[in-house]
């Protein structure tokens, strides 16, 4: 389009679904000549030049570079955290939109925030600036779909149902039934604490109570707002988003509950209206020092490059940090321990290589040391504290070589290699440069496929010449029973189910990186699916 000045993005590329990862700093600026447009981009309605983002504030905002298939609901969702959205005009042919907020103050907050943290829709950066128009007047007969969606959102914001007879598209929002949200965290590569959830969801209203728990091997939470409208806005804005880059995906639904009964204030549950509640009997899920480290390091306000809550100085600081190249995975790499102590091992069977393979499912193992004077115990050093925590959460209590292993955080900060010339009988191995690390490539799909040990294994990198019977025989030879098998359509991947989780663990240890010929080494991981 003539008159559009090319944007310059500074910093680290950021996907649309990153809530706590690196931000992008941009300088959108445009000088559009007068154009005549309607809701579908045809010649009819005249809008005069939209000069520049840092012009006079207006409650009408001009949004550019929208993806072609973006919906009205997605555009409206951009404004919901900042206040009531009162009008919208989609310019489909121009990949642009005008969004009107109820107040100029809300619009200023929105522009300031998105100037520091570039918004994305469908993995595409978009640009938001003030419009020269102080009010958005649209012909509803030409903009019926957008108006229907807006009416639905307005109905939710006022806690009423939509107007009778109003047709709302399938992508439009529906009235909230409950102030309680049910949240499931998929691909939970990094731990998610109660405090992290509180800070993320507090952007949309007062969070009263949170209860976290694990069900069906998935971390879940129930979160209660004071107002159903806040729950609706949070669901609309956050469902499907990632807390961290490429992992920890939020799946949000309304709960059938309308009120949560919280008995204890601890790291699993919290009633923010009752600070007097006891912490409860028993040990917390995390050691208090570790929990504090996670709360500090993963805090939305504390992470350089994080998408902060709606506090503009913090958002600006985040963007500046991203531009300075200081963006990285938030976590406890600074304060958390990277070394695990694994005990109750089968000392007749266990080797550094077998521990490397199993613990390598949950992080990049750097070093392994089986203790010389206590060979049923080992120290395992992971790449960072998040990985050690993840491995501990998933592997503590699992059966390996017939024994239930115990995994705890070690007091050691590193695993020492034996002195040069000293023979430690192969009990210590350095895997720092191993080509088998699953997570050394940033953004790897492996981040999205981390699941607890299960009887079902995911197999990949299968050459065309290998048949189902070949793989069944191969896995049966590990000492277990193959219960089911299913090839994916391209035959490069498959699911294989063993009789027990212990058998699946054994098969993974034995066959991950197995040479199938034709320069194909088998990749094995745990699956959340069943056959």
Swiss-Prot record:
Matching InterPro entries: HnRNP-L/PTB (IPR006536), Nucleotide-bd_a/b_plait_sf (IPR012677), PTBP1-like_RRM2 (IPR021790), PTBP2_RRM1 (IPR035002), PTBP2_RRM3 (IPR034799), PTBP2_RRM4 (IPR034800), RBD_domain_sf (IPR035979), RRM_dom (IPR000504)
PROSITE patterns: RRM (PS50102)
RRM domain sequence ranges: 59-133, 181-257, 338-412, 455-529
A Pfam entry, by short name: RRM_5
GO molecular function ontology, one term from the record: RNA binding
The keyword Nucleus is annotated on this UniProt entry: yes
GO terms of biological process kind: cerebellum development; mRNA splice site recognition; negative regulation of RNA splicing; regulation of neural precursor cell proliferation; regulation of RNA splicing; spinal cord development
Entry superkingdom: Eukaryota
Subunit and partners: Monomer. Interacts with NOVA1; the interaction is direct. Identified in a mRNP complex, at least composed of DHX9, DDX3X, ELAVL1, HNRNPU, IGF2BP1, ILF3, PABPC1, PCBP2, PTBP2, STAU1, STAU2, SYNCRIP and YBX1. Part of a ternary complex containing KHSRP and HNRPH1. Interacts with NOVA2; the interaction is direct.
UniProt protein name: Polypyrimidine tract-binding protein 2
Gene name, Swiss-Prot/TrEMBL: PTBP2
